[in-house]
């Protein structure tokens, strides 16, 4: 049984248990006081706040199935794809530059799929810091590489192993305003914080951690409050963690599961605190749910005509872009209820 198929079953079981618990107790808070009450209306009809204003196909940009997308402080899009390189694209869809090739040297990448049966589920994530430095999760080489915005190699950190500062399979990563880098290791099931120079500051995960921090985690950003916004897809929870490594909030989105959707997998937060949750899918279908700051479900992308591979990314000047499962880059306009 492959990784995603296993998570379909795990997610369905987790959601079922959460709903049962919600029916038996009026207060589902954790010991840390976090909100874990499931939103049972996740499958109801809701307005879609998303309008596609522009779309760029992978072929038109010269990309070989994009894996991840980040927006830099310059407003440009930084995209990794299966050709083992980074491509920089202007908001107007002009390819500005690219760098990288297959290999293990500086500036070379080996993005690998989690399972042979899920070739598009590739660990090749990317993040851009406030100063424009670009960080790439080089999963097959068990390291993170840092570059200037023009693609010049700066440094790398990490090596293969299970020790402190090492990786088994580095996956998601994010950068805070101070330049610290947060890396989720999908195989080791932990999250590590590194200084701007690549020194380990802390590591969370494992049996000794708080329950919400045990398992597989996915994240793409630091929100306006400096919190790492993560999804524990084993427990089907969105978890918010401060830069100190301590959990400060959580909720269960009750993401719909099916034979093609393995529950919640990705989350991002906009400038006013709304959380956008997308799923791990076997097929190019599935919704994206939108929750307000009180974790109330307020809107939903229905999953058609595009299903989002990652939750929307928010640019410095209000731009919103998202990566669809077929590799199309979508520019979105979002109008939420009551806005």
Task: Say what each PLM segment does.
Residues 20-23:
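C-terminal motif of bacterial Sec signal peptides marking the signal peptidase cleavage site
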Residues 38-339:
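Flexible "stalk/tail and boundary" regions
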Residues 25-27:
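Bacterial signal peptide processing site
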Residues 10, 34-37:
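Ala/Thr-enriched low-complexity intrinsically disordered regions
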Residues 1-12:
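Bacterial N-terminal signal peptides that target proteins for export
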């Amino acid at each position: 049984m492959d990784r995603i198929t296993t998570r379909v079953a795990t997610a369905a079981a987790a959601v079922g248990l959460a709903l049962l618990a919600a029916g038996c107790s009026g207060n589902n808070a954790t010991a840390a006081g976090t909100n874990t009450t499931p939103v049972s209306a996740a499958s109801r009809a809701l307005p879609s706040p998303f309008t596609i204003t522009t779309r760029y196909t992978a072929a038109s940009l010269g990309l070989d199935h994009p894996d991840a997308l980040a927006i830099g402080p310059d407003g440009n899009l930084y995209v990794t794809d299966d050709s083992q390189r980074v491509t920089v694209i202007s908001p107007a869809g002009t390819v500005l530059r690219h760098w990288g090739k297959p290999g293990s040297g500086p500036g070379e990448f080996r993005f690998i799929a989690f399972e042979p049966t899920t070739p598009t589920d590739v660990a090749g994530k990317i993040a851009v810091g406030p100063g424009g430095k670009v960080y790439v999760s080089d999963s097959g080489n068990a390291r993170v590489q840092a570059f200037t915005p023009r693609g010049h190699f700066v440094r790398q950190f990490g090596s293969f192993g299970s020790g402190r500062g090492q990786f088994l399979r580095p996956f998601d990563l994010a950068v805070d305003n101070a330049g610290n880098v947060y890396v989720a290791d999908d195989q080791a099931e932990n999250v590590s914080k590194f200084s701007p120079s690549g020194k380990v500051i802390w590591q969370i995960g494992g049996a000794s951690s708080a329950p919400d921090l045990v398992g597989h985690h996915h994240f793409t950003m630091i929100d306006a409050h400096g919190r790492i916004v993560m999804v524990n897809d084993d427990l089907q929870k969105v978890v918010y963690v401060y830069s100190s490594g301590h959990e400060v909030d959580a909720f269960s989105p009750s993401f719909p599961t099916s034979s093609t959707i393995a529950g919640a997998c990705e989350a991002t937060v906009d400038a006013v605190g709304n959380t956008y949750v997308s799923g791990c899918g076997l097929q190019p279908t599935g919704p994206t749910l939108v929750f307000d700051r009180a974790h109330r479900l307020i809107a939903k992308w229905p999953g058609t005509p595009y299903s989002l591979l990652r939750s929307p990314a928010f640019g410095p000047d209000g731009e919103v872009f998202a990566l669809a499962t077929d590799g199309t880059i979508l520019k979105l306009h979002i109008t939420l209820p009551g806005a």
